[in-house]
Amino acid sequence: MIYQPAEDSYLMSRILKEKVPGLLKLNPELKFLEIGAGSGIHLQTAKTLGIKNIFSSDIDKASVSHCNLLGFQCIQSDLFENIQGNFNIIIFNPPYLPEDEREPESSKRATTGGKKGNEIIIKFLEQAKNHLSLEGKIFLITSSLAEDVNFSQLGYNAKEIGCENLFFERLCIFELTREQI
């Protein structure tokens, strides 16, 4: 199932439009990775902003095929399982909702982040360290419906850089960098 753009997708696109131009000035050859590319909306935003080195992955075969048809390099991967190399920007609009037995199996993979909603995010952050350049940034979406993640405990500095209130939840994007030892 290809995850279709929704409020969280539009929030991420807005943040990319705010942040990427400044990062490109510092490094015109920066490498961009999206985990969970879905419909390719963020890949298209990255391309429009002038990023040349765009890579992506998704666990869903249909999403991978769709993004490849759009002209992007996309591989099938469960988080970083099949990813090689380091990246200056890594973005992730993860499945972040707590498990709900009423949700159809067909959509759970795209929306459910585990029993508490944060398990996939934690797994992502544990693996991302091995692929984030020393000065790199992660842009990550979270939801108030999921249990909070202790970013510092996972080795990251975190700054909330954008939020949107919906009638039932608050979506936020965090900019994460490696904690300097």
Where are these regions (language model features)?
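Short helix-terminating capping/connector loops at secondary-structure junctions
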Residues: 25-29, 134
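Membrane-interface junctions at the ends of membrane-embedded or membrane-associated helices
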Residues: 21-23
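Short beta-strand element of Class I
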Residues: 52-55
